[in-house]
A protein has these predicted regions:
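One-carbon transfer enzymes
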Residues: 1-226
Length: 226
């Protein structure tokens, strides 16, 4: 019997990774994504990029509003007994009691070189602070924000001509390229997770735009206009 996984994701960042897994020997038992929402103009219901892609791939989809105090989803995952659960740009907190439901835990791909830029907007912060490099981190989820042990990090240089959308695409493609080998190392028992240096942690808070201005960090104008 092939190893089965549960995939939790929402944004475009997670789509190439889901595609890569669907092409592998792994069995995707379920895809979790955020529920469909009304578009900004309120005229139509809009599904997430992962929802749309999962439908095209014929994958089973679940869209709970929240996992908190959700016995139905807890029991569903418990029954599946997933080999591993992947959480990539999902947009929901994973309750502590869920973390023991998978044989190999919950694996997250975070778009920074942890422990730098934990939080919601690591890609935007890397551009705002004019960093010369960034990357992705394969991390086991624990009960605290982006603070779990790290399996692997992969770095790339930040081209000054890239905007946040371009950089997100590059990091997503990198994650898709590396996802299968990292899952395989975990399933085979060869994975070597290392604790983060929490004293070096920095945070990438969500960026809020109001009346043409960005709040949360002072940055050069040219960085925001890219």
């Amino acid at each position: 019997m092939s190893d089965n996984i549960i995939f939790m994701g929402t944004s475009k960042f997670a789509v190439p990774i889901l595609e890569k897994i669907s092409e592998s020997k792994l069995n995707i038992s379920a895809v979790y994504t955020q529920p469909p929402k009304k578009s900004s103009r309120g005229m139509r219901i809009q599904k997430t990029p992962i929802h749309v892609k999962s439908e095209l791939l014929g994958l089973p989809i679940r869209t709970p509003n929240s996992l908190k105090n959700n016995n139905d989803e807890y029991n569903f995952i418990k029954k599946i007994k997933p080999t591993i659960v992947l959480v990539i740009s999902y947009g929901q907190i994973i309750p502590k009691e869920f973390l023991d439901l998978s044989k190999n835990g919950f694996l997250n791909i975070h778009a920074s070189i942890l422990p730098k830029f934990r939080g919601a907007a690591p890609i935007q912060r890397a551009i705002m602070t004019q960093d010369i490099e960034t990357g992705i981190s394969f991390m086991k989820i624990n009960e605290n924000l982006d603070s779990g042990p790290v399996l692997k990090t992969y770095k790339i240089k930040i081209d000054l001509n890239l905007n946040a959308t371009d950089l997100e695409k590059k990091l997503s493609q990198l994650a898709a390229l590396k996802i299968i080998e990292n899952i395989d190392s975990i399933i085979s028992g060869k994975a070597n997770f290392k604790e983060q240096d929490h004293s070096e942690a920095t945070y990438a808070e969500k960026i809020i735009k109001q009346r043409g201005r960005y709040f949360g960090m002072r940055v050069p104008r040219k960085s925001l206009e890219k």
